[in-house]
């Protein structure tokens, strides 16, 4: 058994103990891809495009209430009359800009990926976090590095 499979099995066990279904499903899919001999073909594609696929799936989920008619222009206008909606709007803008920096950092400094992934694994498995951590984490790291460079 190679190191990648052992590492994935440990992550699966952590996901099981932490009752984190997302982590278990992700690890199971990667193990299946690897064990059926498709790893060399598919894993580089997943590595390269997976974040973009995930962002697309999340975007579809966020837009689904618009498609079902649950949210329309009336609800949008009504929601913007509250302070919390404006805070949510500004938070969405801020997080999107932070994530943009994360994409830049991961593309230009790939060795950061290991630390970011490990941090995400800890948050997902132990604290029931959501696995958007590497992108946001990289974005925050990018912002901090830019501030440090400035001084």
From Swiss-Prot:
Domain of life: Bacteria
Membrane-spanning segments: 5-25, 53-73, 86-106, 116-136
UniProt keyword Transmembrane present: yes
One annotated Gene Ontology cellular component of this protein: plasma membrane
Entry's localization field: Cell membrane
Keywords for this protein: Cell membrane, Membrane, Transmembrane, Transmembrane helix
UniProt membrane topology term: Multi-pass membrane protein
Matching HAMAP family: UPF0756
Family: Belongs to the UPF0756 family.
Protein name per its UniProtKB record: UPF0756 membrane protein GWCH70_2680
Species per Swiss-Prot/TrEMBL record: Geobacillus sp. (strain WCH70)
